[in-house]
């Protein structure tokens, strides 16, 4: 492998999602957005609900929704272990819109702090799914 690309693997609890050489990826880490290029310093961090934007070695763009998990970078090998990962083209937009509406309603109705926090997490996941869906279909 040369220094223009690195191996990226995305695995969810349910499925093997992606494995290929890539030029670049961007992912939502616990401390903010991470841009990953070949030769990135070793790192292990939590990832928040959001997306990973991938540019393959053949300049093909792909977006994958991630519900959270762990990111490991080590010697031009990047591994994402996600709780849930869904390719953008596989996301049901109508379901995501419905999930967003339900979460918004739960936020308004929540009486306990833990209910509110759970609803906010569900809202962030639904918004991330919608974003991935829109980016994948443009």
Curated annotation (Swiss-Prot):
Places the protein is found: Cell inner membrane
tRNA processing as UniProt keyword: no
Coiled coil: none
Membrane topology: Peripheral membrane protein
GO molecular function, one term: proton-transporting ATP synthase activity, rotational mechanism
Pfam families assigned: ATP-synt_DE, ATP-synt_DE_N
InterPro entries: ATP_F1_dsu/esu_C_sf, ATP_synth_F1_dsu/esu, ATP_synth_F1_dsu/esu_N, ATP_synth_F1_esu_C, ATPsynth_dsu/esu_N
Superkingdom to which the source organism belongs: Bacteria
Similarity section: Belongs to the ATPase epsilon chain family.
Record text on subunit structure and interactions: F-type ATPases have 2 components, CF(1) - the catalytic core - and CF(0) - the membrane proton channel. CF(1) has five subunits: alpha(3), beta(3), gamma(1), delta(1), epsilon(1). CF(0) has three main subunits: a, b and c.
Task of the protein: Produces ATP from ADP in the presence of a proton gradient across the membrane.
Protein name: ATP synthase epsilon chain
């Amino acid at each position: 492998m040369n220094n223009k690309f690195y191996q990226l693997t995305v695995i969810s609890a349910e499925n093997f999602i992606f494995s290929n050489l890539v030029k670049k990826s961007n992912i939502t880490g616990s401390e903010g957005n991470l841009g990953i290029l070949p030769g990135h310093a070793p790192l292990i961090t939590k990832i928040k609900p959001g997306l990973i934007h991938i540019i393959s070695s053949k300049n093909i763009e792909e977006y994958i929704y991630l519900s959270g998990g762990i990111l490991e970078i080590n010697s031009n090998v990047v591994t994402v272990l996600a709780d849930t990962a869904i390719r953008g083209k596989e996301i049901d937009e109508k379901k995501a819109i419905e999930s967003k509406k339900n979460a918004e309603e739960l936020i308004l109705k929540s009486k306990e702090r833990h209910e509110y926090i759970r609803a906010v997490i569900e809202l962030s996941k639904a918004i991330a799914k919608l974003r991935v869906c829109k980016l994948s279909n443009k």
